[in-house]
């Protein structure tokens, strides 16, 4: 299991200048990954990279709403904490709905190898026995193993079942499970 704090992660600027990315994990660590998770800041309208044979799940974490224009395939406005899935083959343009910067959680999976499910939890839970997983704290204080996690912190793992405990009356965590085909 690997723990992370978004505030301490390296920042990579996008080539088109529209935003920046903080990579949470890439498994296995190569261009031919099975799954990859990151946090992205979108500062202006811009194009997403086309990634053939990859499914993408994007979740708005904070900031202004973002409308994704997927050519003739879809038009979708991201709402806070509501995951949206689309195929990486689609050329996608992101437009800031009200001009405010947004912060997004992004999860990409190789379609022929694995699938991802992303959801928000608001109570103590135990993960399934998926082959990979990620948690990202949205609010509250949570305990994973012996580690305290607070907003903008999280963890990822390759295998196993793990219990995430909510330590306060209220809190939310973004949770992803990776299953292999």
Curated annotation (Swiss-Prot):
It comes from the Bacteria. Gene3D superfamilies: Jelly Rolls (2.60.120.10). CDD domains: cupin_HutD_N. SUPFAM superfamilies: RmlC-like cupins. InterPro entries: RmlC-like_jellyroll (IPR014710), RmlC_Cupin_sf (IPR011051), Uncharacterised_HutD/Ves (IPR010282), Uncharacterised_Ves (IPR023482). Belongs to the Ves family. This is Protein Ves.
